[in-house]
């Protein structure tokens, strides 16, 4: 089978990747296991810096998952203390800068002239992309780490306590609330909902995937993706902390911690295939390939139709890779030492590497064509261009 890169790239919002920490713990800067040393390789692509900017004081000691967002020719970025900036995607010139009176904790979502974000205080804020002015603020049940997700009418927000709140996109008024039971111990962070016009797909810390009717918030179906096993609470963690990925033909791909990757038929939840890969990252689909970053930072390419493994790269094992992005035929990742890595999507070979900042990269890159925007933990936002 060949990888058809001309097909639409199925990318989902990346700022929702959960940190590999237990709830209530502070973030650390290094992996628990010894990461592989970087090795030399035959470079087939180069990463050239186009511009860089400093976004406040970065992601904070807890490494809040405040991934940037891009719409059109503007990049939006924030720091953990409430600074939000809009930058020209081509040259990094600042378009505006606002200081919110509350600490930011979620990735940003930029859509239809608005920027949406969540805070540590359980607020959701909508900003006007033109000048950063606040359109509305709404209160949800608890801290928000997952990027708010929108369809034409609603903004869906998943809080760290597992509650899902639907807000009116135009006004912030609450439309409905869905609550779920949480295990005693969970990973730090939550899954990010996948929202389409009729329904919302929600991954929960108890290992269940729930499909909610967007008219009412009532469940249409739910499925146990990951089943707790083992004696200790840590062994029994089964969080669905990545974002489900849906394709135009109605397939749904879901990752889970300590469990498996599952392909489902989206309307009823019937299982198409499953693969025994543990992942807390959002997967990426390009052409006929599904790319998964495992919990030990191996990168695996699966046949999206059958689940068969096509290739596996362990060169970056235990380097705390971010969720994948895609640029100019390559997968793009950040790591805990602040490197950006390229892996050839067809072959699985290392293709390029550049270092952004030694503070590390814990949020997924944002890409547009052959352009990569990546925000380091200290707040440095760097734009790189991939060239063969």
Across the structure, where does each feature detected by a protein language model lie?
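Sec-dependent bacterial lipoprotein signal peptides
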Residues: 1-25
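Bacterial Sec signal peptide processing site at the extreme N-terminus
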Residues: 21-42
């Amino acid at each position: 089978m060949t990888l058809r890169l001309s097909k639409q790239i199925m990318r989902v919002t990346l700022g929702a990747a959960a940190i590999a920490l237990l709830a209530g713990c502070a973030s650390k800067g290094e992996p628990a296991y010894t990461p592989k040393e970087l090795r030399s390789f035959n470079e087939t692509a180069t990463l050239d810096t186009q511009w860089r900017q400093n976004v406040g004081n970065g992601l904070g000691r807890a490494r809040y998952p405040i991934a940037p967002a891009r719409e059109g020719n503007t990049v939006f970025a924030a720091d953990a203390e409430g600074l939000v900036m809009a930058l020209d995607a081509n040259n990094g010139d600042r378009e505006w800068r606002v200081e919110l009176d509350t600490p930011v904790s979620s990735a940003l979502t930029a859509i239809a002239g608005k920027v949406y974000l969540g805070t540590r205080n359980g607020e959701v804020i909508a900003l006007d992309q033109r000048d950063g002015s606040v359109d509305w603020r709404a209160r949800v049940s608890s801290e928000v780490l997952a990027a708010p997700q929108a369809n034409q009418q609603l903004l869906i927000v998943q809080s760290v306590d597992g509650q899902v709140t639907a807000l009116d996109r135009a006004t912030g008024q609450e439309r409905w609330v869905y609550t779920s039971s949480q295990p005693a111990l969970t990973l730090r962070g939550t899954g990010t909902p996948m929202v389409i016009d009729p329904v919302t797909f929600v991954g929960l810390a108890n290992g269940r995937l729930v499909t909610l009717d967007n008219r009412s918030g009532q469940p249409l179906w739910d499925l146990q993706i990951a089943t707790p096993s083992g004696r200790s609470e840590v062994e029994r963690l089964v969080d669905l902390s990545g974002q489900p990925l849906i394709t135009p033909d109605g397939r749904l791909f879901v990752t889970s911690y300590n469990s498996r990757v599952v392909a489902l038929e989206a309307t009823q939840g019937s299982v198409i295939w499953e693969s025994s890969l543990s992942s807390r990252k959002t997967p990426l689909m390009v052409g006929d390939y599904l790319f998964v970053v495992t919990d030990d930072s191996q990168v695996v390419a699966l046949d999206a139709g059958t689940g068969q493994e096509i290739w596996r790269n362990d060169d970056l094992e235990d380097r705390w890779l971010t969720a994948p992005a895609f640029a100019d035929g390559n997968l793009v990742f950040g790591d805990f030492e602040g490197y950006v890595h390229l892996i050839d999507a067809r072959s699985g070979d290392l293709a390029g590497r550049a270092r952004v900042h030694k503070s590390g990269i814990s949020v997924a890159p944002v890409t547009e064509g052959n352009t990569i925007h990546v925000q380091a933990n200290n707040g440095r936002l760097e734009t790189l261009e991939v060239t063969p």
